[in-house]
């Protein structure tokens, strides 16, 4: 799938070595269903890697990344069901930025792991603490925009993203107005301090 030539046995030995010397680290090995698309291939995957990890799984490929259609054009991908097998649904307000954000290798903080192009930068971990980013004006403005306008009107990166439709466990759409009022109150309180 990745079309990279490697020494397969050395690759597995490196994973086994890491697993045997992991200390407090948890080793989670996973692949995608498009790479092991038969029962036989899945069985082989579990047999080859099952004894060198704490967790192992075959996850579904879902069309959430920019350029997805071009990358997976040769694969038969289910575009009706989400990551966990449930039916996809329209999500107006993405829940993910309300409980997580990403610090990229260069220190830039973005609101989502799907934003590979870093169009939603809300801080910089080189000069701000995680708490400062989380409580910062840029992040708060992004969240308030999401609540007011929904993901398709809030930001370009969110407009083309399908991640919440395929994997959102939380549905905050019915509570948008209530959450927005709370954010406005918190913002007013911070401004008076």
What are these regions (language model features)?
Residues 1-59:
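Radical SAM/AdoMet-radical enzyme domain recognition
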Residues 8, 90-92:
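Nucleotide-sugar-dependent
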Residues 35-37, 57-78, 116:
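Flexible glycine/acidic-rich beta-alpha junction loops that bind and position SAM and/or redox cofactors
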Residues 71-85, 137-138:
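Short, positively charged
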Residues 95-97:
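Short, small/polar residue-rich loop motifs at catalytic or cofactor-binding pockets
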Residues 100:
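Short hydrophobic/aromatic beta-strand element in the GNAT-like acyltransferase core
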Residues 103-104:
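Short, acidic, Ser/Thr-enriched surface-loop or helix-capping motifs
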Residues 108-109, 114-193:
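Flexible mid-to-C-terminal extensions adjoining Fe-S/redox cofactors in radical SAM and related proteins
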């Amino acid at each position: 799938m990745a079309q990279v030539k490697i020494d397969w046995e050395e690759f597995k030995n490196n994973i086994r070595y890491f697993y045997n010397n992991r200390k407090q680290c948890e080793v989670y090995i996973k692949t995608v269903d498009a790479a092991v698309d038969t029962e036989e291939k899945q069985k082989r995957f579990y047999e080859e890697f099952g004894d060198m990890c704490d967790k192992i799984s075959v996850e579904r490929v879902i069309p959430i990344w920019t350029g997805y259609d071009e990358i997976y054009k040769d694969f038969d991908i289910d575009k009706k069901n989400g990551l966990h097998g449930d039916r996809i649904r329209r999500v107006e307000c993405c829940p993910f930025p309300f409980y997580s954000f990403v610090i990229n290798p260069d220190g830039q903080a973005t609101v989502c792991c799907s934003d590979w192009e870093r169009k939603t930068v809300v801080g910089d971990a080189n000069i701000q603490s995680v708490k400062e980013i989380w409580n910062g004006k840029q992040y708060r403005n992004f969240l308030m925009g999401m609540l007011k306008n929904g993901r398709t009107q809030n930001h370009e990166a969110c407009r083309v993203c399908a991640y919440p439709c395929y994997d959102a466990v939380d549905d905050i759409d019915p509570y948008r107005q209530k959450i927005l009022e709370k954010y406005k109150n918190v913002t007013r309180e911070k401004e008076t301090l």
